[in-house]
C-alpha cells in the first residue's frame, strides 16, 4: 500500500518556485507562468523551462533561505506518521525540485522522492534542470515504477495533488484526491 503526494501546495503550503522567484527578483514573471501551467493552459514542460531559466544566477544560499521559510501543510506530518504506523509506503512525486523534496523526505520520513534536479554550478543556479522534467506523464510513470518495485497494484495506491500536472497520477491510482485543487 502506497500514498503518493505532490509537494508544492499539497505537502507544503507554498510553491517553491515562487519563493525562489522572490529571491531572484522575478516574482511577477514566474507567478504568471505558474498559474497558467497549473490551470493546464500552458504546456508544463515549456512553462517549467521558462520559469527555471528566470532563476539563472541565483545563489545556492537562496535555496537554503527558502528552505527555512517552507511550512509543511497542517496535518501532513501527522498523516505521514499515521500512514507509516499502518504500514503504508509514502512518496513525493513533484514537478518541483529534489533539493526541497529530499529535505522533506528526511524531515517527514518519506520513502520515495522524485522531482526535478535543479542544476547548480559554482554555487549558482544555471537556469536548467538535469534529467527529464517531472511532468504529469512522468509522475504517472514514476508511480508505476514504485508500484512495481513494491510489488503492489495501482488499486492499492492513493495519490494526492492539486494541479493539472497531477491528473495522470490521480487517474491511475486506486484513489485520486484533488487537494486544494486549482480551477
Locations of regions flagged by a protein language model:
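Gly-rich Lys/Arg/Thr-decorated short loops/hinges at beta-loop-alpha junctions or inter-strand turns
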Residues: 30, 56-63, 122-126
Amino acid at each position: 500500500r502506497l500514498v503518493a503526494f505532490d509537494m508544492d501546495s499539497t505537502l507544503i503550503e507554498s510553491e517553491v518556485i515562487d519563493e525562489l522567484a522572490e529571491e531572484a527578483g522575478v516574482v511577477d514573471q514566474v507567478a504568471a507562468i505558474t498559474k497558467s501551467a497549473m490551470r493546464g493552459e500552458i504546456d508544463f514542460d515549456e512553462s517549467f523551462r521558462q520559469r527555471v531559466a528566470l532563476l539563472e544566477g541565483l545563489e545556492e544560499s537562496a535555496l537554503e533561505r527558502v528552505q527555512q521559510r517552507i511550512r509543511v501543510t497542517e496535518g501532513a506530518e501527522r498523516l505521514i506518521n499515521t500512514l507509516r504506523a499502518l504500514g503504508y509506503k509514502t512518496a513525493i512525486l513533484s514537478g518541483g525540485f529534489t533539493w526541497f523534496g529530499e529535505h522533506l523526505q528526511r524531515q517527514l520520513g518519506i520513502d520515495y522522492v522524485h522531482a526535478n534536479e535543479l542544476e547548480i554550478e559554482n554555487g549558482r543556479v544555471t537556469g536548467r534542470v538535469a534529467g527529464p522534467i517531472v511532468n504529469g506523464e512522468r509522475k504517472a510513470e514514476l508511480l508505476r515504477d514504485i508500484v512495481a518495485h513494491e510489488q503492489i497494484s495501482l488499486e492499492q495506491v492513493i495519490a494526492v495533488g492539486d494541479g493539472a500536472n497531477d491528473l495522470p497520477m490521480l487517474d491511475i491510482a486506486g484513489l485520486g484526491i484533488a487537494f486544494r485543487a486549482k480551477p
